[in-house]
Amino acid sequence: MSTKKQKIQKNEIIDTNVSSTITANTNSKITFYPEPVTNQLFPTPVLFAKLPRKFTDEEVEFVKKCSTQVTKNTGNTTSVDRYVFEESALADLKSFVQFYVNYYMTEVESPYNPVEAYITQSWLNFTQPGEFHHKHEHPNSYISGVLYINADPEKDKIYFYKNGYKRISLPTDRYNQFNSESWWFNVGTCDLVLFPSYLTHMVEQTESKDTRISLSFNTFLKGYIGEEASLTSLHVSDRVDTSKWRKTEIDKPKDGRGGSI
């Protein structure tokens, strides 16, 4: 299609491949493209994947065992074991999750220095009908995620919240990903969700008749972060053997005089 411009009356210029124009108060012509495009600038990356199989008997039995050893959380209960991915029964699930953590790092962050995100803590959440997950973030973590062991895709959701101060508050006629303060996604059994650890999230009171079970985890970085030229260089060495210092609600130090230890 030709993009030549043509002269019209009063020496006004319009583009021949633009379908509509509007006359301003100055009698000049302002061109408008037929289909304007709104770009998403600096969007928050939330990754969804799905385990391509059912959970094995060994995995199910391990989860059942953990359900008998729980501690009270705000709104629900969590496993006493805070490193469930270190157990051999979940080795295959850990590999599945690590694959997508690597994918997230490559496709989203795309670092050129040798750096990787590895799983640190991992724990199980048990949410009975009518219970909830309080609104929270995951400090001391880079990417966080959830693998759903038992969830109803028709009723179970995860809510995310926009971070930062809202300068102007306008009543909204039609919610979208630009004007919303929160956004939710349905989740089901075998779904995996990855997101930046700073992103605030929560679960409303569950409506399902079954116990919602999810496996949450954190990650951190290992390798060469930043660069010397920009004075941001940081070398994070080999990961720590967490089995040597893992603490649970049972074996952690008790409150001491003057505060908690």
Q: How would you describe each model-predicted region?
A:
Residues 2-7:
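Arg/Lys-rich low-complexity patches in intrinsically disordered regions that function as generic
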Residues 8-114, 132, 231-249, 253-258:
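Non-heme Fe(II)/2-oxoglutarate
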Residues 124-194, 204, 221-233:
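Catalytic core of non-heme Fe(II) oxygenases with the double-stranded beta-helix
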Residues 117-125:
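A short glycine-rich, His/Asp/Glu-containing loop-to-beta-strand
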Residues 200, 204-214:
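Ligand-binding loop in jelly-roll beta-barrel domains
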